[in-house]
Amino acid sequence: MKTSTEALEAHRPSAVLNTLRRLGFGTVVSVPDSWLGEILIRIDQEPGMTLVRATHEEEALAIACGSRLGGVRTALLVQNAGVLSMGAGMVSLAQRYQFPLLMLVSYRGTPDDPVFYHVPKGRATEPVFRGIGLAHTCTDRYRPIGPQVEHAATYAEEASCPFALLMGREDIQW
């Protein structure tokens, strides 16, 4: 029989939310994506968190940087295609001014998500991230997700830079 902690960790999106709560994230900025729908509803219901819904990714990045500048621990929840479209803002704002932002990124267009219109974005994601110097890693589905989120958040803080954690459907979709 599983303990309640093991059950939460078994449901990876619950573990992500629990980790954000435990680490004291006060603001989450997002551009909606079908995988993110339910976790965003749950974040919006969290007493200690504010969910800000942006209309596009560069706006989300600017809001997240402003929130962080105001001293609030902030996370971005966006799709990988959204990060691709915020390239200039990422380089000239978030990286230039060393904002420690945790970016939880739904990784669309992978072999596990072979929707034809996502595949080109999936192929481009990691090469573009490397090209603009965006620190990132992919989650490991065989390891608990909570510590992976915590490690990514710690890296962003310690390195004073944005860090993108690329997440599969099982990590983020409720």
How does the language model describe each region?
Residues 1-174:
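Thiamine diphosphate
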